[in-house]
Amino acid sequence: EIFYNYNNKTELFGDIYQKSKEETAMVQLIVGKKGKGKTKQLLDKVNGAIKAAEGNIVYLDKSSKHMYELNNKVRLIDVSGYPIKNADEFIGFVCGIVSQDHDLQEMYLDSFLKNAKLEGKDITDALHQLKEISEAYKINFVLSVSMDKEEIPAEFQDDIIIAL
């Protein structure tokens, strides 16, 4: 339990915040081939989430092109500026972000295959790792993945929230 003292009132916030974070901890997928509108869906979702967010929101992208389409409360990180060579390094990069922000509630990963260096490769291990991170740190991940619904591994079919 975490108590905060504010204006001589001691209030319990920790349990309430932790409970609401636990309810949202998951990995969600927006899928569809390149050019189908996944990024627009992701931007709409992140900007809509700002109103209800109790913690911080991070948006990872392959460039800073969408900077002005994001609410200024969302932290945009241009992944192309970092020397990431493979999926393991990308997951390490995500863990680094998680470790530096204890109030992180949601991460939006645009161009997931490109940023995670998984184009043309199996995404199963990376999705499992993101699920583990999500459960361990109570962070909701929303990914845009340039694959058709049928190409997504069977065990992650239930995580698809939008198929274009």
Predicted regions and their residues:
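Sequence-level detector for tyrosine residue identity
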Residues: 4-8, 17, 59, 68, ...
